[in-house]
């Protein structure tokens, strides 16, 4: 069972040290605007940032077109796990680790914990599940990375001006949006760990 104690005792496995090369994947809704980086969802709500200016010029103001509005545009039409893994293997990768959920709060897997996931919205596919099955089928090691911990503050810029982050009907997606220096609640920390 996962706990802070069990996590502190975890030792890096030998296979990981021996592998030397693997693929770490950042891919999600933030790829739709394709501007800046995977931190676009945060930066588009930071008044004055390049992403903020780009967003308004390209999509309109954040109270009319927010980050959530990219989800239907994220279709993953060219996502082909078999081809991806074959390419990774050809490159010499021994393991594949996608980000299951980035700081944006959008899960790339089928889950009942949140409606904001790739199976129920956007591509309507269990991206992580499909990739995991193919990685294992082709004999590589599969792992996951969760970046949910920073969701605590990630979209807090949207609380400082008229944006959709302020709309209560999206609280379950935009998250707590606290200040970075605020102490995370034990409930939030356990939510991230588990």
Regions from the language model: what does each represent?
Residues 1-194:
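Mature catalytic domains of secreted/periplasmic carbohydrate-active enzymes
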């Amino acid at each position: 069972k996962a706990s802070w104690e069990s996590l502190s005792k975890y030792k890096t496995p030998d296979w990981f040290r021996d592998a030397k090369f693997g693929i770490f994947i950042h891919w999600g809704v933030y790829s739709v605007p394709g501007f800046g980086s995977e931190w676009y969802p945060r930066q588009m709500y930071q008044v004055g940032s390049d992403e903020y200016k780009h967003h308004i010029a390209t999509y309109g103001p954040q109270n009319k077109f927010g980050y959530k509005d990219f989800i239907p545009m994220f279709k993953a039409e060219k996502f082909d796990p078999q081809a991806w893994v074959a390419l990774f293997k050809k490159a010499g990768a021994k393991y594949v680790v996608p980000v299951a959920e980035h700081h944006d709060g959008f899960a790339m897997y089928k889950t009942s914990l949140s409606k904001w996931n790739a199976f129920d919205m956007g591509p309507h596919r269990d991206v992580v599940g499909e990739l995991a099955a193919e990685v294992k089928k082709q004999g590589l090691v599969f792992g996951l990375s969760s970046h949910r911990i920073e969701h605590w503050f990630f979209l807090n810029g949207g609380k400082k001006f008229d944006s959709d982050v302020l709309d209560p009907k999206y609280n379950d997606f935009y998250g707590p949006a606290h200040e970075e220096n605020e102490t995370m609640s034990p409930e939030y920390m356990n939510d991230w760990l588990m």
